[in-house]
């Protein structure tokens, strides 16, 4: 237990909070002697652009059973991540340019990111009536 004098002199050290989407926190330095090097920024980015390296399926943990669609994406900062493709059906293939956001998939180990539907090369989900904004679907004509 520190004395009051020790606390006045040193103070308490803040606990560093671990990011749930670390790949979105790295950016390339553009200027200075660290130009071209990766550096970590405290807030990071809400989304990042990337290119699909591989598109495949994955089986979830017990007790679930399915073939979940995932893509391996190389982000603009050079980091490669595994991202989930939400919704029914997709048009993604190798070399597709996608927008990646944070957000894990609970039953897929190692999948901490989602692909944003309706942005860049990822088309919105066809014939979706409810929750359209999450799947990049336009309002249907009456």
UniProtKB/Swiss-Prot annotation:
Keyword tRNA-binding in record: yes
Membrane-crossing segments per the record: none
GO biological process: translation
Record keywords: Methylation, Ribonucleoprotein, Ribosomal protein, RNA-binding, rRNA-binding, tRNA-binding
Region described as Disordered: spans on this chain: 1-21
A single MF term (Gene Ontology): rRNA binding
Keyword Metal-binding: no
Similarity remark: Belongs to the universal ribosomal protein uS12 family.
HAMAP family to which the protein is assigned, alphabetical: Ribosomal_uS12_B
UniProt xrefs under NCBIfam families: rpsL_bact (TIGR00981)
Subunit structure: Part of the 30S ribosomal subunit. Contacts proteins S8 and S17. May interact with IF1 in the 30S initiation complex.
Function: With S4 and S5 plays an important role in translational accuracy. Interacts with and stabilizes bases of the 16S rRNA that are involved in tRNA selection in the A site and with the mRNA backbone. Located at the interface of the 30S and 50S subunits, it traverses the body of the 30S subunit contacting proteins on the other side and probably holding the rRNA structure together. The combined cluster of proteins S8, S12 and S17 appears to hold together the shoulder and platform of the 30S subunit.
Name assigned to this protein: Small ribosomal subunit protein uS12
Protein's organism: Thermomicrobium roseum (strain ATCC 27502 / DSM 5159 / P-2)
